[in-house]
Amino acid sequence: MASHVDPLVVGRVIGDVVDLFVPTTAMSVRFGTKDLTNGCEIKPSVAAAPPAVQIAGRVNELFALVMTDPDAPSPSEPTMREWLHWLVVNIPGGTDPSQGDVVVPYMGPRPPVGIHRYVMVLFQQKARVAAPPPDEDAARARFSTRAFADRHDLGLPVAALYFNAQKEPANRRRRY
């Protein structure tokens, strides 16, 4: 599984979002019919709804899934790094995020300018996390994946994937 780290280094996910780690848990992500691979391009319209995420592991293991945009509001000036798009804790191994506790509901990509990276990081929890009810109005700007991991004693990630997205052109209407 160590070969999965290299694209994360090239894509600057290692460094901008998380520290160097060795993946130890398989995680697959799919938007519609598109399987996510590191660095692939996904249209925001395709990612408007939460992806199908499958997490390996045993059912007695718990995981936390964080999805952020480290390039908000623009890749050249990421003053809101990281923008939190999704946070789910207490996900049993061998299942998906619908089996966990949603802390911050999913928000699809909305890149205003430039090509943005959207990073999904998986942590194995040492214990159950006391999860507040889902909060649509949660502070999403300037979230720190590292600080979240430190606060909940999660250690290094066990898996991560990222994709790129950019603003889609508006549909042009014909005028007669």
Swiss-Prot record:
<dbReference type="InterPro" id="IPR036610">
    <property type="entry name" value="PEBP-like_sf"/>
</dbReference>
<dbReference type="InterPro" id="IPR035810">
    <property type="entry name" value="PEBP_euk"/>
</dbReference>
<dbReference type="Pfam" id="PF01161">
    <property type="entry name" value="PBP"/>
</dbReference>
<dbReference type="InterPro" id="IPR001858">
    <property type="entry name" value="Phosphatidylethanolamine-bd_CS"/>
</dbReference>
<protein>
    <recommendedName>
        <fullName>Protein MOTHER of FT and TFL1 homolog 1</fullName>
    </recommendedName>
</protein>
<comment type="similarity">
    <text>Belongs to the phosphatidylethanolamine-binding protein family.</text>
</comment>
<comment type="function">
    <text>May form complexes with phosphorylated ligands by interfering with kinases and their effectors.</text>
</comment>
<dbReference type="InterPro" id="IPR008914">
    <property type="entry name" value="PEBP"/>
</dbReference>
